[in-house]
């Protein structure tokens, strides 16, 4: 029977430690980490994510603010809002909730954020730092996965890691983080032939494709570690991941559940990176 990798419990533990660090920072330096979340439009799923971030920031003891903007806002107007918070010393982290309306260029908006305040880790400068082995701001989901692997003492050096999904948010940065730990990494996608056969060689399998229960037992080798990033609804409307959990757990050594695995760690890493940005602001 597999060990269930409890991301929720790890997130709670890290959040408690973060509260203590924030309290010490406030006491010693008179600085409170500040996070502003900019929300364009009224996407229901995005609203849920934003509320979760608000709660986490408040719990950590941050100064936080949510800016709600009309879906009809122009790209230039949105950039002006971002520039305002780039210049505001009270805010150390700026997050623009994605997706954005079609008339706004996501890349132009990401470029507008000060890289020092880009707590999502999507600015090309932060991406470049990651690929050059000098990461500062790292996309939060891959960062959270690395914390889970560390917590459960998963050996990466010399191991074979396979990632399903090549997004800029998870797959690509995840590959680089694993390479930094001396894993041998294969990044797969929708055009990868014989996908199950490729995945079956993995000591560590990370799945991030957004397809409910796509990965079955034929994809995993005996004793593998499986990280499920997906969050979907099955035919009965229940939350599930990209991995068929009930099938796969009988074959692997460790696996993250959905919910309660990767998800809680993503928001926790967002808070941690905001705290780290506040620390770096002391150095100018």
UniProtKB/Swiss-Prot annotation:
The keyword Magnesium does not apply. Keywords: Amino-acid biosynthesis, Histidine biosynthesis, Hydrolase, Methionine biosynthesis, Multifunctional enzyme, NADP, One-carbon metabolism, Oxidoreductase, Purine biosynthesis. It holds the Pfam family THF_DHG_CYH. It catalyses: (6R)-5,10-methylene-5,6,7,8-tetrahydrofolate + NADP(+) = (6R)-5,10-methenyltetrahydrofolate + NADPH; (6R)-5,10-methenyltetrahydrofolate + H2O = (6R)-10-formyltetrahydrofolate + H(+). GO terms for biological process: L-histidine biosynthetic process; methionine biosynthetic process; purine nucleotide biosynthetic process; tetrahydrofolate interconversion. HAMAP family: THF_DHG_CYH (MF_01576). This is Bifunctional protein FolD.
């Amino acid at each position: 029977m597999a060990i269930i990798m409890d991301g929720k419990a790890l997130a709670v533990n890290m959040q408690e430690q973060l509260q203590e660090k924030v309290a010490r920072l406030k006491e010693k330096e008179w600085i409170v980490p500040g996070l502003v979340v900019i929300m364009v439009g009224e996407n229901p799923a995005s609203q849920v994510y934003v509320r979760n971030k608000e709660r986490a920031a408040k719990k950590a003891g941050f100064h936080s603010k949510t800016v709600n903007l009309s879906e009809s806002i122009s790209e230039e107007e949105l950039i002006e809002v971002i520039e305002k918070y780039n210049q505001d010393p009270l805010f150390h982290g700026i997050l623009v909730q994605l997706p954005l309306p079609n008339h706004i260029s996501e890349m132009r908006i990401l470029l507008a954020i000060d890289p020092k305040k880009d707590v999502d880790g999507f600015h090309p400068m932060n991406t470049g730092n990651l690929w050059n082995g000098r990461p500062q701001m790292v996309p939060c989901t891959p960062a959270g996965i690395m914390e889970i692997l560390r917590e459960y003492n998963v050996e990466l050096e010399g191991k074979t890691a396979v990632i399903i999904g090549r997004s800029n948010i998870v797959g690509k940065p995840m590959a680089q983080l694993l390479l930094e730990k001396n894993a041998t990494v294969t990044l797969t996608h929708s055009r990868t032939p014989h996908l199950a056969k490729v995945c079956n060689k993995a000591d560590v399998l990370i799945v991030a494709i957004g397809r409910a229960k796509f990965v079955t037992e034929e994809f995993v080798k005996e004793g593998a570690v499986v990280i499920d990033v997906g969050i979907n609804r099955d035919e009965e409307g229940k939350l599930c991941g990209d991995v068929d959990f009930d099938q796969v757990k009988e074959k692997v050594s460790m696996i993250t559940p959905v919910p309660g695995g990767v998800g809680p760690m993503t928001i926790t890493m967002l808070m941690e990176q905001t705290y780290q940005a506040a620390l770096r602001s002391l150095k100018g």
